[in-house]
């Protein structure tokens, strides 16, 4: 059964989103911060239905005072339904990512800094995009004119917790499709009782009579191929459903048809190359795109990516134009029309229908882009790219042996994740070592002078350092590592990595400078200083203190206390009129 596309999505009237909840639970909460806890997890919940006259229609948005622009509503409507080529019968779960438009969102605001400062870079809140997690149902229904019930429940968030939100949808959506609005209102009120996601904490999240236990990853976690085990310290009834990860997908299942090309795909992701993933359905396309963008961890994926993208998207023309080079984006699509539209793209991955048998599916072949001409193009990785590194045959043998021995898929995924993690770390460690060498020595940081500058990153110097401190120290793979680094320097990921590391080093430098000031004899320094110099010191110390207290500087609490004491001491030494200016009542 095809999902038809109408003239365009429009707002359908009525429904839960039409009025604000007035339940007693809602009334009991603080008026100044409505939906504060809910908004720590989700932006809103949307229901998209198919209307014979309107096409895809936004039936409701909840909470009702969350503001979506018309363009965002249109995008959600189209992205919430599989296109007509997918033929998804039954229940389908997938995800999408769309650009935010400007304008005020809601009556509440979530401060991202506290979470982002502690979260792994790859799991920080999206600053400019929404992530949509979709549960779509299409089943025969004789009571409907078209003969089919077609509806999607969409969780809109800025958190990339795909595993958590998919699990949440699998609980909520079937119940919602049966009971509709009252069920959704109750669920949203339950989420509004959840504690905020705090990196490093294990949380128990009650929903519809079930407790989901999750651990929010932290930036200081030891990188492993599998997440830390959950620990339940409370005697919870009912016993919690433990999610081993809020974000990790089943990598082995996602990569099954392309295992022989995992390293080539890893290189393409590392270099930020434009890639189209053409899959038979949005669940396959979105999972594969998310798997590809996650295979660089702990590196943050700095390019654009769209797990599911349609020809109706408001950015369709922008991303498919032939007037300029293809953008650095990974597109997940299901409409074969994209093969013709994106023929000029350098890399196209065509995936066939998934086969869930125990055997390894037929691997897609590497093919030249010139063979990508017809709408019935066969599965394959169409690219003229030649991998810099040799294929790890030992990994493929281990995975194949696991298939033959019917090894659990989560174990297979752990093997694959560890391989990709070690590969990325082997590539990044030399960069980290070289970057660390650019940091000024601590002995050169003196309290009464501006801290020294970080030395510039010189690519030639780095490449020369690889001879004795390169990836060969931690990785057995042979190949043209130098060539890979040279191309990496031109990619968005080098720029993103360098900016982040430089920012962290600059903050560390400033923190060390603050510590040096706090350890100095400030009274001895003030003896021969003018009032202007003393006031200047107060202002600079205050600025550093404000930045440090805003978690922007890595300093200890004792240093902050000492800095405040120094400020008070310095101000106390000034004339009364200046004290009044610096410390107004």
Swiss-Prot record:
Role description: Guanine nucleotide exchange factor (GEF) for RAB14. Also has some, lesser GEF activity towards RAB35.
Any one GO cellular component localisation term in the record: recycling endosome
Organism of origin: Mus musculus
Gene name as annotated: Dennd6b
This protein's record includes keyword Cytoplasm: yes
GO molecular function terms listed in the Swiss-Prot or TrEMBL record: guanyl-nucleotide exchange factor activity
This protein's name: Protein DENND6B
Subcellular locations according to the entry: Recycling endosome; Cytoplasm
UniProt keywords, alphabetically: Cytoplasm, Endosome, Guanine-nucleotide releasing factor
Residues covered by the uDENN domain: 43-221
